[in-house]
Structures are given as structure tokens and as C-alpha cells.
Amino acid sequence: CKNSPIKGLTEVPGAIDPSTGTCLTPPRPVLFCTSPDGTQANQTCKDEGPLTLERSTTVDEEISAKVIDFLDRNDPKKTNKPFFVWYNPARMHITTMLSPKYLAMLGEKGGKDWGINEVGMKQMDDNIGLVLAKLEAMGQLDNTIVVFTTDNGAEVITYPDGGVTPFRGGKLTTWEGGMRVPMMARWPGHIPAGTTNDQIFSMLDWLPTLVNIAGGPT
């Protein structure tokens, strides 16, 4: 939604701006939640302020910094325990605003001719690279299973954000276009680089699989 004048309101904040529609709701809060034992009953959440348009330009940098801090505090060399990180960057869920650094890459000369989506992907890649670099600095990169995927098919109602060819349906449907998504996994010594697997896998199985690999109960 694009911030636009609305009768009776002097200011309409928003967190996304694909230049279509009008924001009728305030921006979402950014919550930082912790739990000493991983249970919801003992969870506390801190409101770190609204995800405004301006903040959305660098919110992924905030998220990656928190992930890196978590990794530092949970380094197995310090804790003698495995760690689990569920890292959810804002990219490429929807077209958030670009910071000056990435705005400068739009239409970049030299054959790239990047648009908003390509530049957003670059920002996401950079932040994932920071997390992988932290794992490498910890000496854990080759001892960590890294999975990269998405939660649903493309939201085709907001074309041209994505497509689902050759599948039927899209986000908010239970057709393959809404449920079947690509996935990449990195597990040195177990998954050969460049391997392609066309088998269907339910992401519901990931958590028990990872727990089992880490030595937890089956």
C-alpha cells in the first residue's frame, strides 16, 4: 500500500510501499521476544517501535544483527550445545522501501539493469551473507545445516510480484501453486554441492528431522 492522503487524517504511516492502494492501518510493531526455556508460557516481548516506511529500509539489517548476536551468545564452544536459528528477513515477502545504498543500484550500469525486485534480492543476499560469514568466523559453517526456503507460493493477485508456472493456484490456495515452493539446503559432507532432488517434502518434517540430527529424541 502507498501512503496517500485520506480525508480526515493528517498522517497515515505505513511499512510497505509497492505504490498501489492506500494504507488504512498503522504500521506493525517490531517485537523482540525472549524465553529462558523456549516455552510460550515464559516468553516476554518488548515493543521496539513501529515498522515505519523509513525503518523498513534497514529492518533486515536489524534482524541479521540480532541473529549474529544470538549466534555469538550461543556458540557451541561456549555452551557445549547445538543451536537453532529461524531467520526470517523481510525480503522478499513484499516490496519494502530501499535504503539510499540500494536505491543507488537501481538501473545500475554495466549490464545489470536492476529493478526493485533485483535490488531487494541483493539486499537479502547481503544480509544472509553476513550470517554465513559469522558461522564461518565461529568455525561452525561446515558443521551447520543451512536451509533456505519460503512459506508459500507467489501472491499472484499482486502481479508482477511473482508467478507459479507451471502450477495451479497461488498464495492463499491449497493448489500446488500455493503450497509447493523451492528449497535449498547446505550440509557439507552429507549433501553433495549441486545436487538436485525433485521429491516432495513437507516442511512440517523439518523440525523433528533437525532435532534428530542434533542428537535429540526421535
What kind of feature is each model-predicted range?
Residues 45-61, 108-123:
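The substrate-binding groove and active-site-proximal loops of carbohydrate-active enzymes
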Residues 58-65, 115, 122-129, 201-208:
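A structural signal for well-ordered alpha-helical segments within the folded catalytic domains
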Residues 47, 67-117, 155, 161-164:
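Active-site His/acidic residue clusters
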Residues 79-82, 86-89, 123-159:
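Metal-dependent active-site segment of extracytoplasmic phospho-/sulfohydrolases and closely related
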Residues 54, 58-61, 65-69, 76:
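Metal-dependent phosphoester/phosphodiester hydrolase catalytic core
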